[in-house]
Regions:
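Acidic, Ala/Val/Gly-enriched low-complexity intrinsically disordered segments
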Residues: 9, 14, 20-21
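N-terminal glycine-rich phosphate-binding loop and ensuing alpha1 helix
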Residues: 26-74
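A residue-level structural signature of the nucleotidyltransferase/glycosyltransferase Rossmann-like core
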Residues: 72, 123, 163, 206, ...
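Short phosphate-binding loop-to-helix
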Residues: 72, 78-133
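A conserved hydrophobic position in a structured secondary element of the catalytic/binding core
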Residues: 75-76, 126, 209, 256
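Conserved core of the sugar-phosphate nucleotidyltransferase
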Residues: 126-223
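Conserved alpha/beta core of the MobA/IspD/sugar-nucleotide pyrophosphorylase nucleotidyltransferase superfamily
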Residues: 189-273
Length: 273
């Protein structure tokens, strides 16, 4: 229930109006990777959310981010492509990519742009402001992402909630499914007490890349750390690519299971959409 309330509060801040004029110095394209196969929710990108396919709702939110010059769906499935072509550009990709970054890179080779933002295809309520700040960071950084404070003790030890620690310059030191850092002097305390003692950060699954950085990154094989944690961003850190972490006050509302559809539809109804 607590997560639901936070999600509703966050969703009330999502902007549905027209975007402001862009002021960035690099041309940035948004790419949404979409796969049909899913163990928990096959065909998820085409699931209807209040009458619209999930992938369409993600595209519409991306288009409200003024920093994006274009929004593209990248898929290896003709069923997704057929639907997505009704409302945006589609690029077909190989089905054999080991990560979303590799899929995005295939599309990047065909694009005339300076930067790319990889937006998760299962977040129909993603705040355009989050996309905006990740894209803007590419004016000065080779790679960027976003993080928010962990407030829910249920997320503290959850391996599906990826944690990140950053240095004084706001760049990632490490990402992990384990709780990091380890609070040695508070190890015996409860999760609530540890959250009060240190500003733990939760990684949000959105990535910005300079095009050249992305194309260089995917030349490297899957790294040992990436393979161990199953976190693709660790390949970048392994090879010395700095990742700027933009801190935002945002709680994502994703669609992971079929039952999440009703939750998102309730939030849309609450917002009058």
């Amino acid at each position: 229930m607590q997560h639901w309330i936070r999600g509703l509060a966050t969703f009330s801040r999502v902007q549905f109006g027209p975007p402001a004029a862009t002021t960035g110095t690099v041309k940035v394209v948004g790419i949404i990777p979409a796969r049909y196969a899913s163990t928990r929710f096959p065909g998820k990108p085409l699931a209807l959310i209040a009458g619209k396919p999930l992938i369409q709702r993600v595209v519409e939110q991306c288009r409200r981010a003024a920093a994006l010059a274009e929004v593209i769906v990248a898929t290896d499935d003709p069923r997704i492509a057929e639907v997505a072509r009704r409302f945006c550009r589609v690029e077909m990709t190989s089905p054999n990519h080991p990560s979303g970054s590799d899929r995005i890179a295939e599309v990047a080779t065909r694009l005339d742009c300076d930067g790319i933002v990889n937006v998760q295809g299962d977040e129909p309520l993603i705040d355009p402001a989050v996309i905006e700040v990740v894209a803007r960071a590419l004016d000065r950084e080779p790679m960027s992402t976003a993080a928010t404070a962990i407030r829910n003790p249920d997320e503290y030890d959850n391996p599906n909630v990826v944690k990140v620690v950053v240095n004084a310059a706001g760049r990632a030191l490490y990402f992990s499914r384990r709780t990091i850092p380890y609070l040695r002097d508070a190890a015996s305390r409860s999760a609530n007490e540890q959250l009060a003692a240190f500003p733990f950060l939760k990684h949000l699954g959105i990535y910005g890349y300079r095009r050249a950085t992305l194309l260089d990154l995917v030349k490297h094989p899957v790294s040992p750390l990436e393979n161990a944690e199953k976190l693709e961003q660790l390949r970048a850190l392994d090879h010395g690519i700095p990742i700027a972490v933009v801190r935002v006050d945002y709680e994502c509302v994703g669609v992971d299971m079929p039952e999440d559809v009703a939750r998102v539809e309730a939030l849309l109804a609450q917002a009058g959409q």
